[in-house]
UniProtKB/Swiss-Prot annotation:
Source organism of the structure: Limosilactobacillus fermentum (strain NBRC 3956 / LMG 18251) (Lactobacillus fermentum)
Cited function: Catalyzes the ATP-dependent transfer of a sulfur to tRNA to produce 4-thiouridine in position 8 of tRNAs, which functions as a near-UV photosensor. Also catalyzes the transfer of sulfur to the sulfur carrier protein ThiS, forming ThiS-thiocarboxylate. This is a step in the synthesis of thiazole, in the thiamine biosynthesis pathway. The sulfur is donated as persulfide by IscS.
Similarity comment: family membership: Belongs to the ThiI family.
Protein name: Probable tRNA sulfurtransferase
Known catalytic reactions: [ThiI sulfur-carrier protein]-S-sulfanyl-L-cysteine + a uridine in tRNA + 2 reduced [2Fe-2S]-[ferredoxin] + ATP + H(+) = [ThiI sulfur-carrier protein]-L-cysteine + a 4-thiouridine in tRNA + 2 oxidized [2Fe-2S]-[ferredoxin] + AMP + diphosphate; [ThiS sulfur-carrier protein]-C-terminal Gly-Gly-AMP + S-sulfanyl-L-cysteinyl-[cysteine desulfurase] + AH2 = [ThiS sulfur-carrier protein]-C-terminal-Gly-aminoethanethioate + L-cysteinyl-[cysteine desulfurase] + A + AMP + 2 H(+)
Superkingdom assignment: Bacteria
EC number(s) given by UniProt: 2.8.1.4
Length: 406
């Protein structure tokens, strides 16, 4: 069926009071960004909902993109007809012909924004329902409480719109309404899921990835970039900041006792992420830590690591177990990429028995053996920033290079 418009309903935006307009404006901007390749599509954000005018564009690919825009509770493809009852009946019958396959219950719900239209909502419900029963005498029956099909009719100034579908959106808040944060992105399963959940709460993210050549490979770096491409479909594009970490890891290994390697290393990672946040107008640092999952994610470890900053360190998957995280990773299509066996810097130089309850004073004293300021400055001087868009691929490019070398 050739639809004329998609009616988008807001989620939590309806609770935002005086701030609602700024949330709606941001959602409108995000929808325009998501649909930028469809030149004929027009976006009209209003107080109660957002209207996507298709102007001949196929609704299916547009709806697939809308499913990935946070801040949308649900949406409905709709037909527009002229403001006369016969046209409404004709469109309603066409909609039902596609959906009625045997005995089916239905009801009609009408909203009238144009109060000059001669037919009231109750009369429209009654007359249109009767016309549909006449058109499908053996299959249709009315059920106003739990119908199989709800036909929604909106009488507006520019026409009458009909829809019977309600498609679930991504929920959450529009990306950009909750401020900006730095996401510490490894190549594992947890941090992409944490990034997804942060985006869903309206946070605009930049990815911070630590890489340690030659201990980590080009494939590991490419994997992290491609994971960012998977996440970019929810926010339009994401800046990927790669931070050279080899010198820091080698120095920590040389000067810090084995049991505290991981703690001091992660203190330096957090220092760098916070420095980037301060430099790039970020308000918080996000990571993929899940309480108790590994040695560095005990509360004692978190205390010893987070000691280096006063900036909020937020952990969206803190209370999730591994199976819950994996389920989300599968749903957002990052799982298969995350489990590719390319070692990242978080697993380089991992001691066999890291401290699960590191002592804060000892962590500070071991870190004091390092030229922290110099190490950080050299790492920050060596960063590279890439803007990554939805669907960008990096692993295949690297595989082609390796194939040529072979």
């Amino acid at each position: 069926m050739k639809y004329d418009e998609i009616m988008v309903r807001y989620g939590e935006l309806s609770t935002k009071g005086h701030n609602k307009k700024s949330f709606i404006d941001r959602l409108g901007s995000n929808v325009r960004k998501a649909l930028h390749q469809y030149d004929q599509v027009k976006i009209h954000p209003n107080q109660d909902r957002l209207h996507v005018e298709l102007n001949g564009t196929d609704a299916e690919p547009v709806m697939e993109r809308l499913k990935q825009v946070f801040g949308i509770q649900n949406f409905s493809p709709s037909l527009r007809v002229e403001k006369d009852f016969d046209s409404v009946v004709e469109a309603a019958v066409a909609i039902f012909k596609e959906q009625v396959q045997g005995p089916t219950t239905f009801k009609v719900e009408t909203k009238r924004a144009d109060h000059k239209f001669p037919m009231g909502t109750f009369e429209m419900n009654k007359q249109l329902g009767g016309a549909l029963l006449k058109a499908f005498p053996t299959d249709l029956s009315v059920d106003v409480h739990h119908p199989d099909i709800t036909l929604r009719v909106e009488i507006r100034l520019n026409g009458i719109y009909l829809t019977s579908a309600k498609i679930l959106g991504a929920g959450g808040l529009p990306v950009g309404t909750a401020g900006k944060g730095m996401m510490m992105l490894s190549g594992g399963i947890d941090s992409p899921v944490a990034a997804y959940l942060a985006l869903k709460r309206g946070v605009s993210l930049e990815m911070v990835h630590f890489y340690s050549p030659p201990y980590t490979s080009e494939q590991a770096l490419a994997k992290a970039k491609e994971l960012t491409g998977k996440l970019a479909k929810y926010s339009g594009s994401i800046k990927f900041i790669q931070v050279p970490f080899t010198e820091i890891q080698e120095t920590v290994k040389e000067k810090v006792p084995e049991g505290y390697l991981m703690t001091v290393q992660r203190r330096l990672m957090l220092r760098l992420a916070c420095a980037l946040a301060q430099k790039r107008a970020g308000l918080a640092v996000f990571n993929g830590e899940s309480l108790g999952q590994v040695a560095s994610q005990t509360m004692e470890s978190m205390l010893a690591i987070e000691d280096v900053t006063t900036m909020p360190v937020l952990r969206p998957v803190l209370s999730y177990d591994k199976n819950e995280i994996i389920k989300i990773a599968e749903d957002i299509d990052t799982y298969d990429l995350s489990i590719l066996p390319y070692e990242d810097c978080c697993t380089v130089f991992t001691p066999p028995s890291p401290k699960t309850k590191p002592n804060l004073k000892r962590a500070r004293s071991y870190e004091a053996r390092l030229d922290v300021e110099g190490l950080m400055q050299r790492a920050l001087d060596g960063i590279e920033i890439t803007e990554i868009h939805a669907g960008d691929e990096f692993l295949n490019q690297n595989q082609d290079v390796f194939a040529e070398l072979l």
